[in-house]
């Protein structure tokens, strides 16, 4: 906004200067009890927040559009703007109005952005809130993520933009920073909170210097990240952005970690979506894996569990330690005593971040005090059980002196804000107690003065009051105002009363106001000093919060295992998945009837199962439960099965269901083929691959050919551990032609025209698809079902003839080259016979006995 500031009022000139420094974001400009917005900001905020758009006088000869929000309710408005992906610069008055000449000095004290907020009211409690920078150089893609609410700082390098897209989908970022010349901007479509940043923010030397200054180091070698140069460029950008928005030191960001894909079982975007890990296909959180597993008692534990679910690990030693702890907590019956203690710890992780940023509120400190008070009892209940658990407890530490400090310093239930006063406890500071005593004595003094003045003047309506504008006053009703003594100085005239001041009251007012002001100022100083006293042990408290989060997750998983009858899985270094009595962890919780448990057996000699069976028979549920059980094992959880042995896995792929991608202009079939191509390129012999109904979106010949070729590729080329569900019965001949392939089917029983789904997995191929029976269940008209039966009988006859003619082992009608001419099929709506016409013409209520007898003979004749 280029303006000639000389044409504007001094206040608007000040506003425009501040706005020029923050051109792309909303500016909340503090004026008294309101944050005001002007010009285009006002129009935008009025639309987004549904607040009134008004005008404020004129500046440079033009009316000024204006909108505002009360300062005491600003958090709610900020929360809405942040949820919409907007950023806001908060501009406060920092000068003293009493001494200012011209506009009070103001400056932007912080910038609230979706990815860097730390205020409790602006954050999703049980979900990570991340800002990330992405960068590409010479074909290498990188992402650096920062959690401002915990200080967690991670970098990753990725081989291609598809891997980056999958990572973005996993992280569900609140804000994404990218360079102006980023080469793959198309993958950012449909994301909000996008911020284009200048290229210089991604320069390597600048990034390394910035990171070293932040961590107080000379080199990044100690973090093991020095060779990840592309990722360091991204890290420099995101750290610069954090410093720019927070306008304060960031002591809780004290390390950086390089995440390697080789450390995790990789899940692509389609797999996360299809398995409904933390979000269901409708976009909600109900009936997801997280909804079943997450009964954590702390928000920070809940967030950690979701990270585990989205990023299962391959470190078997670490997994076995998690299993040991879960096992021990169950056997030693420590779940029940630990969970209430952990619940009282609350969100210690985010409270510590606000302490580091010096934005913690009084109630944050009381919650921290409560959290620290739980630590001795938590340690007592968790230690001396296993070496793994002892190592975790050792991180919790002893903070008894900090707990004692907060106990002395903060009252039991403080007000929400320090500016309201009354936060620091009595006895903590002698000077503060003196000022408070002076201020508190005002009530008694004023009562005595009021009684004395009434008696001296004889005015029974006289009373002493106070307001923020005029201070203390003596009020007399209009009917008795003529009795006011000469030394009473009129201060204000009201409709029914006069207000006066006397020298004694004015002197006392100055003294009391000074005491209140001094009390509030000293209290704010003491409160700020508390941060200084907490800061030396911030790093240790962060480690404790991490350990408590993990203990919460493991205690939660122990409770889930106990409540839901889960078993401890075992791991094998060999390829394979061997599950007995496996159950779908989500479906079994929502079914009213008992869930039918099923086995699966895959290994190097039996690595592809062709899964057949009717629609609604449970094929998709069966395949998903195998993936979910495997994933649960790789986060360290117990699993819903009678027993489970899981071999080495590097990736889990799913190709289940599809719909049009309208935003990208891709059809259902194109989406399906894109996902399939990704699997065929990326899958290895250690990948678990689930394919459901590939090839449905095109012609029958094309679909069957593609399904056959994909199955053959997976069986022969990649030899991945694969479940391949299909309605193409031609594929059931694959086991006779390829090594390592077997048939299984979901059982069903047909009785007359109805079908009963048994939901049990049996060896061998299904005998038929039961498609017509399922169609009848869905309410398809009976005449349509009858016509379909006729068509089916004809096609099956042709298929049989083709097999006999060509001795074709696959010999299905779909590969027959000589389909005969289709015979005449009965029309959908048949013509009425003479008998039916005669019967329809009879009205029984109108017939005499003789006419009825004649009609009966006529109908009998027509039948003959």
UniProtKB/Swiss-Prot annotation:
Keyword DNA damage included in the entry's annotation: yes
GO biological process: mismatch repair
Ranges in coiled-coil conformation: none
Binding site for ATP: 613-620
Annotated GO MF terms: ATP binding; ATP-dependent DNA damage sensor activity; damaged DNA binding; mismatched DNA binding
Entry keyword set: ATP-binding, DNA damage, DNA repair, DNA-binding, Nucleotide-binding
GO cellular component annotations of the record: cytosol
Family: Belongs to the DNA mismatch repair MutS family.
Biological role stated in the UniProt entry: This protein is involved in the repair of mismatches in DNA. It is possible that it carries out the mismatch recognition step. This protein has a weak ATPase activity.
Protein name stated in the entry: DNA mismatch repair protein MutS
Species, as recorded: Actinobacillus pleuropneumoniae serotype 3 (strain JL03)
């Amino acid at each position: 906004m280029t303006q000639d500031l000389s044409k504007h009022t001094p206040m608007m000139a000040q506003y425009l200067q501040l706005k020029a420094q923050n051109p792309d974001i909303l500016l909340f400009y503090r004026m008294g009890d309101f944050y005001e917005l002007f010009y285009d900001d006002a129009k935008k905020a009025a639309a987004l927040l549904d607040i009134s758009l008004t005008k404020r006088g004129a500046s440079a000869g033009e009316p000024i559009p204006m909108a505002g929000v009360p300062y005491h309710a600003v958090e709610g408005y900020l929360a809405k703007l942040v949820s919409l992906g907007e950023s806001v610069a908060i501009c406060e008055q920092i000068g003293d109005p009493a001494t200012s000449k011209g506009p009070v000095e103001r400056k932007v004290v912080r910038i609230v952005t979706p990815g860097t907020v730390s205020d409790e009211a602006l954050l999703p409690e049980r979900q990570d809130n991340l800002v990330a920078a992405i960068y590409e150089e010479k074909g290498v893609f990188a992402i650096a993520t920062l959690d401002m609410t915990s200080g967690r700082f991670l970098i990753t390098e990725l081989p291609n933009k598809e891997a980056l897209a999958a990572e973005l989908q996993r992280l569900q970022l609140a804000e994404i920073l990218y360079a102006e010349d980023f080469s793959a901007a198309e993958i950012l479509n449909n994301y909000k909170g996008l911020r284009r940043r200048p290229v210089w923010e991604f320069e390597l030397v600048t990034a390394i210097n910035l990171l070293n200054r932040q961590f107080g180091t000379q080199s990044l070698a100690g973090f093991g990240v020095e060779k990840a140069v592309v990722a360091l460029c991204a890290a420099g950008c995101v750290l610069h952005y954090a410093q720019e928005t927070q306008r304060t030191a960031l002591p809780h960001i004290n390390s950086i970690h390089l995440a390697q894909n080789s450390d995790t079982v990789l899940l692509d975007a389609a797999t996360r979506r299809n398995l409904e890990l933390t979000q269901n296909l409708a976009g909600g959180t109900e009936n997801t894996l997280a909804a079943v597993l997450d009964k954590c008692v702390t928000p920070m534990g809940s967030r950690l569990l979701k990270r585990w679910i989205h990023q299962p690990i391959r470190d078997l030693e670490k997994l076995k330690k998690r299993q040991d702890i879960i096992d021990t907590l169950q056997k030693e019956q420590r779940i029940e005593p630990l969970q209430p203690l952990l619940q009282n710890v609350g969100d210690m992780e985010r409270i510590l971040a606000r302490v580091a940023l010096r934005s913690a509120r009084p109630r944050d400190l009381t919650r921290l005090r409560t959290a620290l008070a739980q630590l001795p009892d938590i340690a007592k209940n968790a230690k001396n059980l296993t070496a793994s658990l002892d190592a975790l407890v050792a991180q919790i530490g002893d903070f008894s002196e900090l707990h004692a400090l907060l106990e002395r310093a903060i009252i039991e239930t403080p007000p929400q804000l320090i500016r309201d006063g009354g936060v620091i406890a009595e006895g903590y500071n002698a000077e503060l107690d003196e000022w408070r005593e002076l201020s508190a004595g005002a009530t008694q003094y004023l009562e005595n003065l009021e009684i004395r003045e009434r008696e001296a003047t004889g005015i029974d309506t006289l009373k002493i009051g106070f307001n923020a504008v005029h201070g203390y006053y003596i009020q007399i009703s209009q009917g008795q105002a003529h009795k006011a003594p000469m030394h009473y100085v009129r201060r204000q005239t009201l409709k029914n009363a006069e207000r006066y001041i006397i020298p004694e009251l004015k002197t006392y007012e100055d003294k009391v106001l000074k005491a209140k002001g001094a009390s509030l100022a000293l209290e704010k100083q003491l409160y700020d000093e508390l941060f200084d006293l907490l800061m030396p042990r911030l790093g240790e408290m962060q480690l404790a919060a991490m350990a408590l989060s993990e203990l919460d997750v493991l205690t939660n998983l122990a409770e889930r295992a106990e409540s839901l009858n889960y078993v401890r899985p075992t791991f094998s270094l060999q390829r394979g998945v061997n599950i007995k009595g496996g159950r779908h962890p989500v479906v079994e919780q929502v079914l009213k009837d008992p869930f039918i448990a099923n086995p699966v057996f895959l290994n190097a000699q039996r690595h592809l199962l062709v899964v057949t069976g009717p629609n609604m028979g449970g094929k998709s549920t069966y395949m998903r439960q195998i993936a979910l059980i495997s994933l649960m094992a790789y986060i360290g959880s117990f699993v819903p099965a009678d027993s489970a042995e899981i071999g080495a896995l590097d990736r889990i792929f799913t190709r289940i269901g599809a719909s049009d991608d309208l935003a990208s202009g891709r059809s259902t079939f194109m989406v399906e083929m894109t996902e399939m191509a990704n699997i065929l390129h990326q899958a290895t012999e250690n990948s678990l691959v689930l394919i459901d109904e590939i090839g449905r979106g095109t012609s029958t010949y094309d679909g069957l050919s593609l399904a056959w070729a994909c199955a053959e590729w997976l069986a022969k080329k990649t030899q991945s551990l694969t479940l391949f569900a299909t309605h193409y019965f031609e594929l059931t001949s694959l086991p006779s032609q390829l090594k390592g392939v077997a048939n299984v089917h979901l059982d069903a029983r047909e009785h007359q025209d109805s079908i009963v789904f048994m939901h049990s997995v049996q060896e061998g191929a299904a005998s038929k698809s039961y498609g017509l029976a399922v169609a009848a269940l869905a309410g398809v008209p009976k005449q349509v079902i009858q016509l379909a039966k006729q068509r089916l009988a004809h096609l099956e006859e042709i298929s049989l003839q083709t097999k006999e003619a060509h001795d074709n082992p696959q010999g299905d009608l779909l590969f027959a080259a000589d389909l005969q001419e289709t015979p005449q099929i009965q029309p959908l709506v048949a013509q009425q016979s003479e008998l039916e016409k005669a019967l329809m013409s009879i009205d029984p209520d109108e017939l005499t006995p003789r006419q009825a007898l004649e009609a009966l003979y006529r109908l009998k004749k027509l039948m003959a």
